């Protein structure tokens, strides 16, 4: 395996993934801007809607987001009246969408879908492979970050 970069090429997986994530995030953020949502806020609404009711820790795990960052995002959505929280077991909070939040999610979903469809179409038949590679990169990175897991 070569670690030599050609002129203008960046070989670092971490750098390339961060650059791609920022560019992709900006693309989706522009699509969601008319709804005063960003990509993470939309992902939160979409995942809660899919689950119906969802514990905060399950959402944090699914989106691979630290609790403090999630709580900040949830506070904004709750303040705007899009989500509500109920007490769960212990200190756990159970999240659900309000009617206003569900209505916003449905309106924003159309803009998200246009962007998603364009992205998928641009990859063409390579989309399933690309998606599989993203899942692998995430799983590998998480395993390598967890000293109890090691490299699989």
Give residue spans per PLM region.
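N-terminal leader segment of winged-helix/HTH proteins
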Residues: 1-35, 152
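Short alpha-helical elements of helix-turn-helix
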Residues: 11-15, 35-46, 71
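Short, locally clustered residues in the helix-turn-helix/winged-helix DNA-binding domain
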Residues: 18-21, 46-50, 109
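Basic amphipathic alpha-helical segments that dock to polyanions
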Residues: 45, 59, 77-80
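Charged, amphipathic alpha-helical coiled-coil/dimerization segments
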Residues: 53, 75-132
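Residues within helix-turn-helix
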Residues: 56-57, 68, 93
